[in-house]
Amino acid sequence: MRYLSKDILEEVITQRPSDSYKSNFGRVVLIGGNRQYGGAIIMSTEACINSGAGLTTVITDVKNHGPLHARCPEAMVVGFEETVLLTNVVEQADVILIGPGLGLDATAQQILKMVLAQHQKQQWLIIDGSAITLFSQGNFSLTYPEKVVFTPHQMEWQRLSHLPIEQQTLANNQRQQAKLGSTIVLKSHRTTIFHAGEPFQNTGGNPGMATGGTGDTLAGIIAGFLAQFKPTIETIAGAVYLHSLIGDDLAKTDYVVLPTKISQALPTYMKKYAQPHTAPDSELLEQKRSR
C-alpha cells in the first residue's frame, strides 16, 4: 500500500510552459445533471475548470443551461436532446466524465450507452455517481477498460463489484478490480485507489466533507488533472489527495466543508505545489498534442 502525502502533488503538478494555449490542457466533456440534480454537474464543472482543464463542455438538461452559465461562464453547454452535437463533442474529447446528477431514467441509459459505444482508446472515461449504478444494472461492457476510472462510494461499489460492504476488504477489492480491468477510486473516510499495481490510500479527509457534492467535486478534479497532466495513476492519486488536503485545511475553521469552497481554492493550492518542468516548453507542448 502506498500512502499519499504532499509529495504526490509535487510529482504531478507542473508549471505551465510560457507559450501555452488552452488546447494544450485538454478538452473535457462532463455529462450529467437532470432536471432534479443540476447542482451535481455544476459542482463537477466548477472543479474541472478550477483544476485547470483547457476547454470544458457540459452536456446536461436544458433546465441547467442558465444556472450553469451563471456559475461557470467558462464552460460551453450542450443539451441532452442535441443528439448530433452531443455525439460530435464526445468524439473530440480527451477526457469524458459521466454521471454526476445524471439520474437513472431512459434518457440517462441512452446517453451512457452512446458514450460507452463511442469511447476511443486515446480517451479517459470517468464513470461516477448514477452512471455507476446504471452500468451495474445494465448489460454494458467496456471497450478499453484500462482507460476507465470508476469513482464509487461503498454502496455503489457493492452494486458494481457484488461485494457487500462488510466484505470489501483490501484483497477482495483488488480481485474485483482485476476482473474489471479499470481504475477504482473507492471513496470512504480513507479513500483507496485500486489499479493494476500497488494500491494508493489517501491519508486526508475529515467528517466536515461528508456533505452533498463532495464526490461530484472530486470527479471534476480528476477530470481536470487527467486532461492536462501526464495520464497516469499518480495523476489520479494527486487529484484525490489535493481534494482532501484543501478540505482538511478548510475544516480547521469551518464546521462543514462546502465542496464549492474546495473548488475555489484549487488554483491557489496548485500554484503552491507546481514544480518547474525539465523539458523545453516546445517539447512539453508537443507531448500534450500527441497524447
Curated annotation (Swiss-Prot):
Amino acids binding (6S)-NADPHX: 40, 103, 153, 216
Span of domain YjeF C-terminal: 5-273
CDD domains in the record: YXKO-related (cd01171)
InterPro entries according to UniProt: Carbohydrate_kinase_pred_CS, CARKD, Ribokinase-like
Keyword terms: ATP-binding, Lyase, NAD, NADP, Nucleotide-binding
Cofactor (UniProt): Mg(2+)
EC nos: 4.2.1.136
Residues annotated for AMP binding in this entry: 215
One record GO biological process: metabolite repair
A Pfam family recorded for this sequence: Carb_kinase
Gene3D superfamilies (alphabetical): 3.40.1190.20
Annotated catalysed reactions: (6S)-NADHX + ADP = AMP + phosphate + NADH + H(+); (6S)-NADPHX + ADP = AMP + phosphate + NADPH + H(+)
Physiological role: Catalyzes the dehydration of the S-form of NAD(P)HX at the expense of ADP, which is converted to AMP. Together with NAD(P)HX epimerase, which catalyzes the epimerization of the S- and R-forms, the enzyme allows the repair of both epimers of NAD(P)HX, a damaged form of NAD(P)H that is a result of enzymatic or heat-dependent hydration.
Homology family: Belongs to the NnrD/CARKD family.
UniProt subunit comment: Homotetramer.
UniProt name for this protein: ADP-dependent (S)-NAD(P)H-hydrate dehydratase
Native source species: Enterococcus faecalis (strain ATCC 700802 / V583)
